[in-house]
Every structure is written in structure tokens, then in C-alpha cells.
A protein has these predicted regions:
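Bacterial N-terminal signal peptides that target proteins for export
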Residues: 2-15
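Sec-dependent signal peptide cleavage junction
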Residues: 19-35
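Blade-edge motifs of beta-propeller repeat domains
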Residues: 32-35, 77-90, 135-139, 226
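Residues in Ca2+-coordinating acidic/glycine-rich loops
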Residues: 45-53, 98-105
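Structural core positions within WD40/WD-like beta-propeller blades
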Residues: 54-58, 108
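Beta-propeller domains
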Residues: 68-73
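Short aromatic loop motif centered on NTY/YTY
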Residues: 92-123, 130-207
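Beta-loop motif signature
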Residues: 194-249, 253-259
Length: 260
């Protein structure tokens, strides 16, 4: 996949998402295992792994410019996590609770800054010995959120905004292994164009079907081998997304042929 023509797809993944707007994600959740956690309101849910409901409370303090200067998470009235947010320009925090099993309960914290930029995003697990939350993810500034949780699987919806395609989102599955969330596969066929959801012109109708029109002649590859060439003004269909060494590639179909 070295010579993919969509050069802007070949960006370092965390960097590409560091300066992007927060995705207009759907609020549809797996109701049985994923919950939104309101700030400054107690959520009763098991986070310690004993099967009993714990008290989870998230609070924030503001500076004179209405930015959050400190985030605090309490579990059963004891401080389990603090974050100094001074100079991070965070306006608000969103939080989600996810239960995979009685031993794997997770808490996602996302800090939102100016223009809905994602400033902070991590997933945490509770340590019963230290009574503290510790990170099990490497999300950093990426735009993603937990959407469902099962016994052995956590699903996150991710997003990016390549210049050639506009907003895309997709889902990735993770397993909890050695106290870390690990991708089960680096390739997904769930990738979708979402920019067509906000307009009603002829191109938007195509985007809603994952169809794009080439602005110039493009070459598509399978590995280092040229798969096919598409003339200007032709339609190609987005089929898959894959991640390799912090690089994102997109697979398109032209007729019966596919290439990256």
C-alpha cells in the first residue's frame, strides 16, 4: 500500500486528529452497557469490579476566563483521578461509562476546547489497590467515543476529515488484554462518508452511498503494484479503511476492481 494516490490519507493518525472538530456522533448507545455520565451528578454503576453499584462523581472547576482548570473524579467519595487543565483551553468535559464484564468496567473522559476541538481523550480503568483510575488507551487527541460494550469486546466510533473525502467515520473493535485496549483488527468495512448528511445537492446524494467523483486521473494500488487507473470525472465507491504504522489507507472500488 506504499504508493497510495490519496497522499493526504497517509498522515500520522494521532496528528491528523489533533486539530480537528469533534465529530457530530450519534448518541445511540448500547443501553445495557454504555452510559453517558453527567458532570456534577452522581452516577451509580459498578467501577470496582465487585458487581455492586459504586458512586461515580465528576466535577470541574473553572478559571476567570471560563476555561476548565481542574478535573476531578471521585469513586465512593474518594478522589480517584485529577487532571490539571490549566492552559489547555478546555470548555467542557464529556464522560462515558462502559461495562464489558464485572472485571472490566471502563470510564472515558473527553475534553472539548475552542471550535469543538478535542483536547483530551482517554479511557480509564479503576485499580482496587491504589484506588485510582489508570489509562488503558492511547487515544490522546483523537476523535472517537465508546458506542457499545460486550463481555469480550469494546466498540469505538472513530472519525477523521481527509481533504479529498471530507468527514468519515468508522467503527473499530477492541479487546482488553494485559490491562490495555488492543485492536482486534486494523481493517474495517464500516467506514462511511457523513458529509452528505448535511446537504442535499447531487454530490451529497452520492456521498450518502459512499460514492465519490474523481477530480483528476487517479492511480490505485494493491501493495506496491498498480491495481488500476481511474480517469477524471468517474465514480468510485469507498469500501474499506485500514491502519498501518500510524498511517490510514482507504480502499475504493471501480467497476469490479478494488485498490488503495
Amino acid at each position: 500500500m506504499k504508493n497510495a494516490i490519496f497522499k493526504l490519507f497517509k498522515v500520522t493518525f494521532p496528528f491528523a486528529l489533533a486539530f480537528m472538530m469533534c465529530l457530530p456522533f450519534s448518541m445511540t448507545l448500547n443501553a445495557a452497557s454504555v452510559k453517558n455520565i453527567p458532570v456534577k451528578k452522581i452516577l451509580s454503576a459498578d467501577i470496582t469490579g465487585d458487581g455492586k453499584a459504586d458512586k461515580i462523581l465528576i466535577t470541574t472547576s473553572m478559571d476567570k476566563d471560563c476555561f476548565i482548570k481542574k478535573l476531578k473524579v471521585k469513586v465512593n467519595n474518594k478522589v480517584a483521578f485529577t487532571k490539571n487543565c490549566t492552559n489547555n483551553n478546555i470548555h467542557s468535559f464529556t464522560a462515558r461509562y462502559a461495562k464489558m464484564s464485572n472485571k472490566n468496567e471502563l470510564l472515558q473522559l473527553m475534553g472539548i476546547g475552542d471550535n469543538d476541538y478535542i483536547v483530551f481523550n482517554q479511557i480509564y480503568k479503576y485499580n482496587n489497590k491504589s484506588k485510582k483510575l489508570y489509562s488503558v488507551s492511547k487515544l490522546d487527541y483523537t476523535a472517537c467515543e465508546i458506542v457499545s460494550a460486550k463481555k469480550n469486546l469494546l466498540t469505538l466510533r472513530h472519525g477523521d476529515q481527509p481533504a479529498e473525502t471530507g468527514w468519515l467515520n468508522w467503527k473499530m473493535n477492541y479487546k482488553f488484554r494485559n490491562n490495555k485496549l488492543v485492536l482486534t483488527s486494523t481493517t474495517t468495512s464500516t467506514v462511511k462518508s457523513i458529509i452528505g448528511n448535511y446537504h442535499n445537492d447531487s454530490y451529497s446524494k452520492l456521498f450518502r452511498k459512499n460514492i465519490f467523483v474523481t477530480e483528476k486521473k487517479l492511480r490505485f494500488y494493491n501493495g506496491s503494484k498498480l491495481a488500476f487507473t481511474v480517469p477524471k470525472g468517474k465514480q468510485v465507491t469507498l469500501k474499506k479503511l485500514t491502519l498501518s504504522k500510524n498511517t490510514m489507507y482507504l480502499q475504493f472500488q471501480y467497476g469490479k476492481k478494488t485498490g488503495w
